[in-house]
């Protein structure tokens, strides 16, 4: 089945709109533009689709309300701008969707919400309940309280995480560019447009450039990585220009617009997807070549004897990274032992665990049922 048919038939969509598409060149929110997005999403809703909107714009709106002309560099100033701007962003979306008889809900997420399994499931339940009630959730990172999200995060990644969270059928990333090119077309006039590719293809990241403006955070690379992440749950991604007239309606109608990134066939198990979606891990273990081979080729559990080094501090039950001696991540899994315990039993046979610790929680450091290969 062609990708555009899958987009057309998708029941649950996640739409991410960038700062440049909802602000007046960074000078606060562009209410007319937001009105157009509300109208397009209302049309999708009328066609029977569920839509979750991931919207940038809070910091830009906060800057305008505070009279700032340049994006500040200090984290506390960015947090202040986000706090002020989030009020305006929610108000404008609420009023514009109300014109179409649609209620909206503001949902602010942090990495911690998605890293903790219980909070992850609660967030999923809330979002699915909102969709069932006919509400359009409008999601943003909680920039006001989480410094890492402002400093390192972006809403492209958040869009992919939300797609996986709700098991969306497709992620649509709208930007001020036509889509993906083999090079930055603003610097390389001979750059070729990429209309279709497989999400996660190594050559895609090599094509991507840096951030495009001082207002937003996400460059094309973040969109490529977001598509790769969304593909793990079986969701396709479209990167398209939000300047195209009625772009959402046309995509939903099956028209091939922008760069369409196909997801490989199949959907990863929900718990394994949750492990992959951890952006920040508190620890990792270095494996010898034999352990790497048994994990990747043999489908075996990770035993303490295959661990050469334990890095970071983590508790039992946390997600940890498993890397080879070159530092390449090969797997992630739920550990049966804390970092302190793992250091004591590293390079030891499972039969020696009780003699070392005085007890045995499990014969494996990570059981294969709690392990996901990367």
UniProtKB/Swiss-Prot annotation:
**Classification via SUPFAM superfamilies:** Carbamate kinase-like, PUA domain-like
E.C. designation(s): 2.7.2.11
Quote the protein name from its UniProt record: Glutamate 5-kinase
What coarse category fits the chief subcellular location reported for this protein?
A: cytoplasm
Q: Which residues bind ATP?
A: 16, 175-176
Enumerate the PROSITE patterns for this protein.
GLUTAMATE_5_KINASE, PUA
What are the residue boundaries of the PUA domain, all occurrences included? 282-360
Which Pfam families does this entry report, sorted A to Z?
AA_kinase, PUA
Reaction it catalyzes: L-glutamate + ATP = L-glutamyl 5-phosphate + ADP
Q: Which organism is it from?
A: Ralstonia nicotianae (strain ATCC BAA-1114 / GMI1000) (Ralstonia solanacearum)
